[in-house]
Amino acid sequence: MKIIFMGTPTFAVPSLEKIYKEHEIISVFTKVDKPNARGKKINYSPIKEFALANNLKIYQPENFKDNTLIEEIRNMQADLIVVVAYGKILPKEVIDIPKYGVINLHSSLLPRFRGAAPINAAIINGDTKSGISIMYVEEELDAGDVILQEETEISDEDTFLSLHDRLKDMGADLLLKAIELIKKGEVKAQKQDKKLVTFVKPFRKEDCKIDWTKTSREIFNFIRGMNPIPTAFSNLNGTIIKIYETKINDKVYNNATCGEVVEYLKGKGIVVKTSDGSLIISSAKPENKKQMSGVDLINGKFLKIGEKLC
């Protein structure tokens, strides 16, 4: 099939790689280049890097308001547009162009977690499973009929990164199956149950702050779901400490307040009081320091007993 691929981050690369091997990629659309943190070097998206390495035609429009661009897409005579974490919403004029429409890979079991950050949300909300949905694209965000879905279990050892990496490979394989069904005319798409729809908004910095008045399980899930992106944090004496890994501790400290450092556990880390128990911080990054283990936090005396995270 003749395919236009639209994507941007690392998550989209396995999908483009597999489609490139089995189909004709007419062009690749990705978000505009961005300067790095210091503003001295332009960073290409992972999808652009792949496209350049394989001599694929690249487009990086700010939007799809240019009639000339719409006409150029129309002249490509694509059978299908495939979208994987592109980061832009397509207008109806583009959706209507390809012979077989536009399909999207979404990293949740729709209709749960439409929108941004569904991988983070699944872990933060304590879900025991997540997955991939391949769906048709409509004007309404993530509302199209679902072509295929595949599930994966979420364990207590999973973080955003581990689930992200698992889903990006699962998604690439499922996408190829969906394209084959479309090619053969064997798609039996299912409408989403509107009663089960939930949404996830992009995370703001303030959304990443840990609320120590929540339960140990809730905070444990929150930190895992933020690891390593966008990273959960707390304030400590006017500085920021990013927290990457914790373990649920059985011990309850009734005389302490939530967020208080209550104990050092030798060989494990620093214990912090929660609403129903405590957590052991086993990996964190104090402001202007490198990421370190809980043991190194103790040895460096970065968190003292009696201090409070807030």
Swiss-Prot record:
An annotated GO cellular component: cytosol
EC number, as in UniProt: 2.1.2.9
Enzyme class per UniProt: transferase
InterPro entries per UniProt: Fmt, Formyl_trans_C, Formyl_transf_N, Formyl_transf_N_sf, Formyl_transferase-like_C_sf, GART_AS, Met-tRNA-FMT_C, Met-tRNA-FMT_N
Keyword Methyltransferase in annotation: no
Entry keywords, A to Z: Protein biosynthesis, Transferase
Catalytic activity reported: L-methionyl-tRNA(fMet) + (6R)-10-formyltetrahydrofolate = N-formyl-L-methionyl-tRNA(fMet) + (6S)-5,6,7,8-tetrahydrofolate + H(+)
Superkingdom of source: Bacteria
GO biological process, alphabetically ordered: conversion of methionyl-tRNA to N-formyl-methionyl-tRNA
Sites where the protein binds (6S)-5,6,7,8-tetrahydrofolate: 108-111
One Pfam assignment: Formyl_trans_C
SUPFAM superfamilies (UniProt xref): FMT C-terminal domain-like (SSF50486), Formyltransferase (SSF53328)
CDD domains: FMT_core_Met-tRNA-FMT_N, Met_tRNA_FMT_C
GO molecular function: methionyl-tRNA formyltransferase activity
Similarity comment: Belongs to the Fmt family.
Biological role: Attaches a formyl group to the free amino group of methionyl-tRNA(fMet). The formyl group appears to play a dual role in the initiator identity of N-formylmethionyl-tRNA by promoting its recognition by IF2 and preventing the misappropriation of this tRNA by the elongation apparatus.
HAMAP family given in the database record: Formyl_trans
UniProt cross-references to PANTHER family, sorted A to Z: METHIONYL-TRNA FORMYLTRANSFERASE, METHIONYL-TRNA FORMYLTRANSFERASE, MITOCHONDRIAL
Entry protein name: Methionyl-tRNA formyltransferase
